Amino acid sequence: GGMPFWLAMVVVPLAVGTMGLVVERFLIRPLYGRPIDDPLLLTFGLAYVVVELVRIVAGKQGIPVEMPEALQGAVDIGIGFFPIYRLFLIGVAVAVVAGLWLLLERTRYGLIIRAGAQDPLILRVLGVQVARVWLLVFGLGTGLAAMAGFLAAPLQGAAPEMGIPVLAEAFVVTVIGGMGSIMGSILTGLGLGIVEG
């Protein structure tokens, strides 16, 4: 039963990304202009609310997620055997990072996002609808987080609290890597992954 893996890989990020749009519009947006602690605490608190809601709906044990047959097993990469699913994860990660980099560095929309992160007032002066930009950024971020959780599920099961440890790590990566630096965040994330094994 359940939705096929490949379909769910598309549907889950879209559904959660849409929920992210609603959260940004009605919960996060009223806090813009306030100290950064306020939206930060709200999103941390919201994460715990979501965990409890998932526990109520899906149970405390979580749900086992089976990886597709095509991604099971291992392949010889010359220095030993490596799980096919982990190679698939590396491929997806590279594709997502490349897509984000192209979006932020090579498009007008990316220029607006980067400018807004530095000085939102300039964008308002230029007539850019900053609220719409942040709405789409938040939706994209929640969608990508959902994809990461979905892809991790076959390795550890879809448990209600599976995202909580990642919250702290994401915060560390953002702070050390630099708020506006995608390359800094990538390198910090890679470093953290290597340290954790």
Where are these regions (language model features)?
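Transmembrane helix-bundle core of multi-pass membrane transporters
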Residues: 30-31, 36-106, 130-133
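Membrane-interface helix caps of multi-pass small-molecule transporters
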Residues: 21-30, 57, 102-106, 151-154, ...
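A helix-boundary/kink motif common to multi-pass secondary transporters
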Residues: 4, 32-36, 118, 129, ...
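Transmembrane alpha-helical segments in multi-pass inner-membrane proteins
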Residues: 3-14, 135-145, 149-150, 155-197
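Helix-loop-helix "hairpin" substructures at the membrane interface of multi-pass membrane proteins
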Residues: 80-159, 182-188
